[in-house]
């Protein structure tokens, strides 16, 4: 059975790119456009991994991440943060000192090999 990945990004082109890349490599995907939708999808789709943009309308990636790691059912789901804003890696780390760190940070534009390597490290 294919491992499941939830792609959370407000940019349609980024979502499509990630979905095609991941599905072409044997993963099952679902998408969410913001943190609100992502939390709902997590409970329905039960992903093995989440790729997460930080800057999104409605609920940000940071707020979604806080909710995810506090949810006992999904706290151990690896999260790969994909952001085009480099400084958010440091800001994110500083503002979440008491929380588990995301599995990885990947800068946009996303390098296919780097992302696939991190996904395989996280879930096989």
Go through each PLM region and give its residues:
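Active-site residues of response regulator receiver
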Residues: 9, 53
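Charged docking surfaces used in two-component/phosphorelay signaling
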Residues: 16-24
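Helix N-cap/capping motif at the beta->alpha junctions
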Residues: 31-40, 61
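Short amphipathic alpha-helix used as the core "switch/output" element in two-component signaling
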Residues: 40, 62-75
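Active-site beta3 strand of CheY-like receiver
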Residues: 45-51
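Receiver (REC) domain active-site loop signature in two-component systems and cognate sites
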Residues: 56
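Alpha4 helix (beta4-alpha4-beta5 surface) of REC/receiver domains from two-component response regulators
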Residues: 63, 86-107, 113, 117-120
